[in-house]
């Protein structure tokens, strides 16, 4: 799989970008702040419908523009697919597949499969559980695009149930049973949708764990072994069925009903889960050194890459300024993986950040002041 063409309109610092890409290695070179990361971010957005840098879409639209458009042409086993994503503030985003509108942008998920390495990856180890849940859900969705719908349904249920919990607390003291009966209905919705999401995550971690262990040994031979485990907010065994999770969620919500009403928040469900990262007998978060944290973060991405490769065609590798963050051993390990990928798209502040033996096409990025303000440009 590779991206043959990338077009941007009013995306971040790019008023317009029109790039012909090819298999192999391509390096976008330019000083920090010139917009090279925005190119990688656009490709990641096309693959996942999300940014690796911000939680909302609004910052992706260039200042003063009404919308941003990301268009890609992806080639997979000789077949071309064109994806257009239109990002608009305050309105639902739109998508087209082969120039035809689709009902939801989620319908284009799976066209571009990618794995991103970025400086932000350190948050996978040192950040809060939400970072690790997002990693799992993005990877699960890349493997099975239908998971995006499961996650969207679950998020909707959480919003509705949280609002109901806030109002139900007062209703209980007024003796209003109708609100509590409605809460029972939403308990069922949370259990049904949450169980599907938890089962998908557990299945993913089951397949991911041996790949993480192997990747960490590659990056840090002789170090403590790395291990991962899906830790839920309920008492559940590893790698169980959706039916088991559904029953366990219903039981947990019954037991924690008073606490949820008192606090007005959902205390049970996959939004409270975590991906446990361990080095030897210690948790990586709080105990891993800076180098060990980087090795663990890279191991999670390398494992994702290997898992997607076993599913089918090679995913596109996106390397956002990571070589500058790594020591020599980790640079070599990452370069070895990149050597076998069908397409690698890399950003670097200076050409010296790229391995010296790489045969790579280089695209220089600059900034220019014009009628659109300060915008990113490709040097001709």
Curated annotation (Swiss-Prot):
**Which InterPro entries does this UniProt record tie to the protein?**
DNA-binding_RecF, DNA-binding_RecF_CS, P-loop_NTPase, RecF/RecN/SMC_N, RecF_2
Taken from the UniProt entry, a GO cellular component term is: cytoplasm
Gene3D superfamilies recorded: P-loop containing nucleotide triphosphate hydrolases, RecF/RecN/SMC, N-terminal domain
UniProt keyword list: ATP-binding, Cytoplasm, DNA damage, DNA repair, DNA replication, DNA-binding, Nucleotide-binding, SOS response
Q: Which Pfam families match?
A: SMC_N
* Top-rank taxon: Bacteria
SUPFAM superfamilies membership: P-loop containing nucleoside triphosphate hydrolases
GO MF annotation terms: ATP binding; single-stranded DNA binding
Q: Please, one GO biological process term?
A: SOS response
Keyword Acetylation part of the UniProt annotation: no
- Compartment annotation: Cytoplasm
Residue positions annotated to bind ATP are 30-37
Q: What does this protein do?
A: The RecF protein is involved in DNA metabolism; it is required for DNA replication and normal SOS inducibility. RecF binds preferentially to single-stranded, linear DNA. It also seems to bind ATP.
Which family does the record assign? Belongs to the RecF family.
How is this protein named in the record?
DNA replication and repair protein RecF
Source species of the chain: Mycobacterium sp. (strain KMS)
